[in-house]
Regions:
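Flexible glycine-rich active-site/ligand-binding loops centered on an Asp-His dyad
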Residues: 171-189, 375, 443-451, 455-461
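Non-catalytic linker/capping segments at the edges of enzyme domains
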Residues: 305-374, 394, 400-402, 417-418, ...
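Short Pro/Gly-enriched beta-strand edge/turn motifs at strand-loop
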Residues: 5-9, 322-328, 423-424
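Active-site beta-strand->loop segment that positions catalytic residues and contacts the acyl thioester
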Residues: 79-83, 404-422, 428-434
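Short aromatic-glycine-enriched beta-strand elements
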Residues: 435-440
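Active-site helix/loop of acyl-thioester processing domains in fatty-acid/polyketide metabolism
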Residues: 258-271, 344, 374-400
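C-terminal regulatory domains involved in ligand/effector binding and gene-expression control
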Residues: 1-88, 93-312
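Extracellular/lumenal ectodomain signal focusing on beta-strand-rich modules
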Residues: 89, 278, 342-346, 410
Length: 461
């Protein structure tokens, strides 16, 4: 499966729901592995904000992401359309603080993407599997969102409000291909009891009675309806038999639940990844949705950081080494107490596997730490670097040159290494970078990755 973007740029204009500012949104293609990026073209420097859950800054009446002093609000309807249409790399250029609300749904965003056209890119798409149950519960807000392992992407939303209309309503989606007809046209909604306070707080400047369903959840007088009509610049408003204010006709009997499902899709797009899993959300809102997005994102990042079983080196004590310590000393200049490779188990043109036995009588344990011995992380890294140098020197046969490491990056230590552990060190050669030899160094204890680093090597005379 390939990554996707759009064929050509497309633009939409309109006011934002909460600020009421007229904005222009221009949607552009982006290169593979870009993800979703918002660009505030109205601000100095045109700052970019990646659409990821880590950058969520507010969820009071929509989802806002921020980076430094730049932010973009009410992004969920746009992202729901983007994600559901299978688009992976998009640049959103916007000249204001909020995405246009349009009709309060994803309908016009879907139409814009179809107008722009969709194309496959020359890059594989990785779809991650949720392999354990994830749950977010907020007892104060009475929210519960769970994600379970599944072979596909599925969602179910349950609404349970103190309202006759929304006391028990649900919606589900088992295939994103059904989003365009069954979910995208569903408009946002608000309770009548919330409406006037929001208006007085200036939190709904761009809303009118054409882009939001108003659920009548309280007894109201004609005087109150007349006041609302004046606030929205309408001749009059009335309660329909469906319990909805104004003349909007519900497109589905469960349109509010379907819209909540739309919001969940948009907010979960902030994971930054495609994934398979079954999401069940009871009384979802932007806060709970984005908290679940953070959980899923971290779950996937943890998967990415774990090496594939095929890439974990296998070592047994009875395995015959390719090089013993004596042979290693013929290649490396290091000597006790600063030689941290005991054996070389295998060596190819692209990879070496070395071993360091961490014994109880290592000299550094007397001070690091008494009664709680731990191998210093600097020495774990040194063991990786010595294995890397041995790989480079051995790969060049009679070449008398040596090597230095001008840059070591992305160093991660994942757990302590203690007496009795056997450090299995794997160093692999990857593509050259800026004229340097790029190596990937990893250290394992058993099948567990305990340390890793990217190493740039340079030949010297």
């Amino acid at each position: 499966m390939k990554q996707k973007t759009i064929l050509k740029e497309v633009s939409l204009k309109g006011p934002g729901l909460h600020f009421g500012q007229e904005t222009c949104l221009t949607i552009k293609p982006a290169s593979p592995d870009t993800g979703y990026i918002f660009k505030r073209v109205d601000l100095e420097g045109k700052p970019e904000i990646p659409a990821i859950a880590d950058l969520v800054s507010d969820t009071s009446r929509g989802t806002t992401i921020s980076k430094y002093k730049a932010s973009v609000s009410t992004i969920e309807h746009l992202l729901a359309a983007t994600y559901s249409l299978g688009l992976d790399n998009i640049l959103f250029e916007i000249d204001g603080p909020e995405v246009p609300i349009l009709d309060g749904s994803s309908k016009y965003f879907v139409e814009a993407f179809h107008k722009a056209g969709i194309k496959e890119q020359d890059a594989e798409l990785k779809v991650y599997e949720i392999n354990e149950n994830l749950s977010f519960v907020d007892e104060e807000r009475d929210i519960e969102i769970s994600t379970f392992p599944d072979k596909s992407y599925k969602l179910k939303v349950l609404l349970d409000y103190k309202s006759e209309i929304l006391s028990n309503q649900y919606a589900f989606l088992n295939n994103l291909k059904d989003f365009t007809k069954g979910v995208a046209p569903c408009r946002t909604f608000v309770f009548l009891s919330e409406l006037e306070p929001l208006l007085h707080l200036n939190l709904i400047k761009g809303g009118d009675l054409d882009n939001a369903i108003v659920i009548v959840d309280k007894e109201s007088t004609q005087e109150e309806f007349d006041r609302l009509a004046k606030l929205f610049n309408k001749p009059s408003v009335a309660v329909q038999s469906s319990g909805v204010l104004n003349n909007l006709k519900l497109q589905f009997t469960n349109e509010p639940a379907r819209h909540k499902l739309l919001d969940v899709i948009g907010d979960l797009a902030l994971t930054g990844f495609r994934f398979n899993g079954s999401v069940v959300a009871r009384r979802p809102g932007h806060f709970g949705n984005t908290e679940m997005a953070k959980l899923i994102r971290q779950h996937i990042l943890n998967q990415k950081n774990q090496p594939s079983p095929d890439n974990i080196p296998v070592y047994t004590q009875n395995s015959k080494p390719l090089m013993d310590s004596q042979k290693i000393k013929e290649i490396l200049p290091n000597r006790y107490p600063f030689l941290f490779v005991d054996k070389i188990m295998s060596l190819t043109k692209t990879e070496v596997i070395g071993v360091k036995n961490v014994s109880n009588d290592e000299y550094y344990f007397s001070g690091h730490y008494p009664n709680n011995p731990v191998m210093p992380v600097a020495l774990q890294l040194e063991a990786i670097l010595q294995t890397a140098k041995l790989f480079l020197l051995s790969s060049n046969g009679s070449d008398k040159n040596t090597y230095e490491f001008p840059q070591i990056s992305n160093i991660v230590f994942k757990r302590q290494v203690v007496p009795g552990d056997v450090l299995i060190i794997k160093v692999s050669q990857v593509d050259p970078v800026n004229g340097f030899i790029r190596l990937k160094g990893e250290a394992f204890v058993g099948t567990e990755l305990v340390a890793e680093a990217d190493i740039d090597a340079k030949k010297i005379k």
